[in-house]
Amino acid sequence: MSDTIRIALIGATGLIGTTVIGQCIGREDVRLTGIARREMKLPRGIRMELFVAEPAKWGEVIEAIRPTALICALGTTWKKAGEEEAAFRAVDLDLVLETAQAAKKLNVERFVHVSSAGADPMSGKFYLKVKGEVERELTKMRFGRLDILRPGLLVGKREGDRRPAERFGIAAAPLGNLLLHGSYRRFRAIRADSVAQAALALAKRAARGRFVHDNDGILRAAKTLPQIEHEAT
């Protein structure tokens, strides 16, 4: 077993955050600490700490736990933001960057950010434009290691906020994936398990630099995470 790494998780209550937590059950090579705005039910068998605090206090929490790496799975949906651009930016841009700035100030070495396929600050689509702006600003912060994950449509169990179009996309994903080739491969649906595994694997890597991972890169990284044998229940 490799040395234990201390990882902070922001966005612990969302699809990727909860999946990261699930992937840490039985892992002795990861000491996970979640940071969230509300209480959440933790899965059976997980050994981790969960700090519940307002975002203004997250810097203090990061300072207290002193993680080597931070996984940022923070994000809202257009529906949860009340379909207002300012409310969406407040979470997906402002809060992400404020968290990253606090981590950088406290000398967190590695930052893993879950973005989106198609992220581009010049995009004509608001969602992808915001995601691209975040990536651009994170790159300027010069973490020792920065990994940006750009998954396509996420497939996994999400707490009751699936939009009709998103539910249809997931149902059609097997066929859609077969039709997406070349530069469009990056938009293929991908399991949340794979994204979570990749985030953990990348958080454990010490090589310095800035790296962007599309769907194929995410799947490759996920395969490098050592597997854990869970006890039968």
Where are these regions (language model features)?
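N-terminal Rossmann NAD(P)H-binding glycine-rich loop of SDR-like oxidoreductase domains
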Residues: 2-27
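Oxidoreductase cofactor-interface core, primarily capturing Rossmann-like NAD(P)-dependent enzymes
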Residues: 5, 27, 121-229
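SDR active-site strand-loop-helix element
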Residues: 10, 35, 73-74, 111-117, ...
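N-terminal Rossmann-fold cofactor-binding loop
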Residues: 28, 34-39, 54
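Short loop/helix-cap segments at secondary-structure boundaries that form the rim of catalytic
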Residues: 38-47
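NAD(P)H-binding glycine-rich loop region in Rossmannoid oxidoreductase-like domains
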Residues: 48-98, 102-105
